């Protein structure tokens, strides 16, 4: 008999920006952008007040400034964010040992056999959110479902400071009208390819046979087939091994930093394509350089959300170049672009029975 699974995805609300607003009362209620200023800088995070103007994580900082001229830019303090993240994780561990962190601000929890004595997954999620608020003065949203894929979608449903449950008996009804662009892993390019074939919702996807989806979209076709049916058998894995994918290029002639643009763009494309062939998503972007004197230096950046396109990866890599502080006349013999902090893509299974608490039923 298949074990009944109860999975919670907890996502802190505008985490980096919320920490800044918590610690500096003058920032509360104002549009806050967590980013270094500069032509090549990118946005780490944006408060909800800034998001109203269209500011998003991984966006070039100059664009964020154009969209929201009154935004207050705050340089990131990752040591502080990590300390808060550890507080939050300690709360998770009171309820289950099966905690899979995805980044500083989100994690999956398997509460099928909870430690805390609370039986309903919805009550566990509500308790965790209350403890986070009480102990950190921050808010979190939660999704509760029979698997990781659905829990991830559910956590976005009532943001900020809310929770949403998708019980197994409602999975089909929930997914049928869901736009394919709400499915993790379906970006603008894939959305366009699907729309060209008349596929706009998960219900449309269900009309396609597996063999036809695989013929049209290769190995990703199976993921689409499974997602449309709410299928995801991946376990919550507390000890995910960190991996990375990178591409490097050694030049025939040493180049100046300003001459590396084309190489960085090409390498970002190679790294992105290599990542697409795996079932994993990289969160941390790394730029590697080797000088003519064989000195190696790296610059890295972890946005609030993983890069969702080659263009985002490219822009972050180019922004990291601006953080290289060697003399302008320094020449380089090698450049590399990498992605690290990997986790599995969302997708791959069938739900099992789920308890539902009061006031947590899906909206029609």
Swiss-Prot record:
Monomer. CDD domains: PolY_Pol_IV_kappa. The keyword Transferase applies. Coiled coil: none annotated. GO terms for biological process: DNA-templated DNA replication; error-prone translesion synthesis; SOS response. Residues 7-187 form the UmuC domain. Its cofactor is Mg(2+). Mg(2+) binds at residues 11, 105. The active site is at residue 106. This is DNA polymerase IV. The record marks 16 as: Substrate discrimination. GO terms for molecular function: damaged DNA binding; DNA-directed DNA polymerase activity; magnesium ion binding. Gene3D superfamilies: 3.30.70.270, 3.40.1170.60, 5' to 3' exonuclease, C-terminal subdomain, DNA polymerase, Y-family, little finger domain. One of its GO terms (cellular component) is cytosol. It is found in: Cytoplasm. Signal peptide: none annotated. The keyword DNA repair applies. Belongs to the DNA polymerase type-Y family. It comes from Stenotrophomonas maltophilia (strain K279a). PANTHER family: DNA POLYMERASE KAPPA, DNA REPAIR POLYMERASE UMUC / TRANSFERASE FAMILY MEMBER. Poorly processive, error-prone DNA polymerase involved in untargeted mutagenesis. Copies undamaged DNA at stalled replication forks, which arise in vivo from mismatched or misaligned primer ends. These misaligned primers can be extended by PolIV. Exhibits no 3'-5' exonuclease (proofreading) activity. May be involved in translesional synthesis, in conjunction with the beta clamp from PolIII. It catalyses: DNA(n) + a 2'-deoxyribonucleoside 5'-triphosphate = DNA(n+1) + diphosphate. Its EC number is 2.7.7.7. Keywords: Cytoplasm, DNA damage, DNA repair, DNA replication, DNA-binding, DNA-directed DNA polymerase, Magnesium, Metal-binding, Mutator protein, Nucleotidyltransferase, Transferase. It holds the Pfam family IMS_HHH_1. HAMAP family: DNApol_IV.
